[in-house]
């Protein structure tokens, strides 16, 4: 303790942008995306939904939303969290097909995701598993950005950010890509 001293600690280890390239998102088309998965470990679980929107000048240009058949029953905790059921996934395309479609749809556009490390880990795992090439898109992580800009907030969950920033929020749909 140093009495009479005010100290600010800044965590310079926060990764906000992965595979950084020069982009100005204000005048560039970019993709906001999210994934839903069978669990929390990219090595043993897989994606069951990829959802995304292409945005330019704050306008949605296009949407991508595909469910994926994991060919195994979902854990109840995932159904409870996402409201995605086995019946909804049965007969949908496989993870390799949907991942390839998504990557083709994105092209070389920069990506934005909340808690991007999670989504990136599943994208990288799918690319490796299905020989789709290296996943090296530029990705901006809004959760890391919020941690850096607002370290005093109680947490940096999407629900907290939307409330603090006065952004409309649908509690029932937040765990759907």
Residue ranges of each PLM-predicted region?
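Conserved non-catalytic scaffold segment of RNase H-like nuclease domains
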Residues: 26-136, 151-171
């Amino acid at each position: 303790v140093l009495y009479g001293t005010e100290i600010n600690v800044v965590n310079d280890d926060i990764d906000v942008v992965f595979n950084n390239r020069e982009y100005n998102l204000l005048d560039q088309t970019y993709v906001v995306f999210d994934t839903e998965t069978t669990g929390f470990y990219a090595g043993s679980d897989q994606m069951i939904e990829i959802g995304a929107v292409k945005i330019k000048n704050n306008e949605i240009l296009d949407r991508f939303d595909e469910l994926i058949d994991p060919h195994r029953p979902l854990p109840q905790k995932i159904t409870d969290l996402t409201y995605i059921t086995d019946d909804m996934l049965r007969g949908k395309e496989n993870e390799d097909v949907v991942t390839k479609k998504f990557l083709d749809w994105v092209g070389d556009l920069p990506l934005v995701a909340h808690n991007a490390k999670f989504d990136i880990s599943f994208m990288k795992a799918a690319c490796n598993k299905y020989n789709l090439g290296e996943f090296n898109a530029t990705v901006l992580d809004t959760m890391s950005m919020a941690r850096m800009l607002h370290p005093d907030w109680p947490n940096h969950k999407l629900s907290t950010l939307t409330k603090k920033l006065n952004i409309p929020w649908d509690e029932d749909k937040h765990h759907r890509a």
